[in-house]
């Protein structure tokens, strides 16, 4: 009998919505309750591609928009062997951003269609659950360190949010919207409940492929 696979859970949202905080809390809580769980963050900045992206995000270098979109996708693809291996070992993975951020942030730029933006990520491991942390842009901008990295401007984040809203219309993906303006503990409780459901369901079905 095949061992139960772990769930692939993604945290998405505009910048400073609390994804990293909630990802860490979720992994800690899942491990405390007997699950095997780990956190991965995208971009994964330790690889050669990731270092290039880190320099770009910190505004130290400039890259052409099409090229940088493909690099973000490549950064996800280079983690696919690890993701699949962990899931097959029964480890639940919590991802701080994934392909949806890649599509939304490029789609927010001029002259990019969402269809074009999706293409490089077609076939990535399909998440069992995507948690969108909903936060008013003014509230996000008021949170610490907003504006330090590229893309952290109110005007651009508004366009990003519109792209996310279009992505959430897809019926074959398991999106759950969470009100991130609530207290950290309230948000965590809701995320935890959705995640426990996803873990139970993932154990009964094979891993899918994104946008296929």
Curated annotation (Swiss-Prot):
Q: What class of enzyme is it?
A: transferase
Q: Which reaction does it catalyse?
A: dTMP + ATP = dTDP + ADP
Q: Which HAMAP family match?
A: Thymidylate_kinase
Question: What function is annotated for this protein?
Answer: Catalyzes the phosphorylation of thymidine monophosphate (dTMP) to thymidine diphosphate (dTDP), the immediate precursor for the DNA building block dTTP, with ATP as the preferred phosphoryl donor in the presence of Mg(2+).
Similarity comment: Belongs to the thymidylate kinase family.
Looking up NCBIfam families in the UniProt record yields:
DTMP_kinase (TIGR00041)
Q: What Enzyme Commission number(s) apply to this enzyme?
A: 2.7.4.9
Give, as in the UniProt entry, the pathway in which the protein acts: Pyrimidine metabolism; dTTP biosynthesis
Q: Which UniProt keywords apply?
A: Acetylation, ATP-binding, Kinase, Nucleotide biosynthesis, Nucleotide-binding, Transferase
Listed name of the protein:
Thymidylate kinase
Instruction: Note down the stretches annotated as region LID.
Output: 133-157
Entry superkingdom: Eukaryota
- Modified residue annotations for N-acetylalanine: 2
Is the keyword ATP-binding assigned to this protein?
Answer: yes
Q: Name one GO molecular function term.
A: dTMP kinase activity
Q: What does the record list as coiled-coil region(s)? A: none
Alphabetical list of InterPro entries matching this protein: P-loop_NTPase, Thymidylate_kin-like_dom, Thymidylate_kin_CS, Thymidylate_kinase
Oligomeric state and interaction partners are given as: Homodimer.
Query: Please, one GO biological process term?
Result: nucleotide biosynthetic process
Q: Which cofactor does it need?
A: Mg(2+)
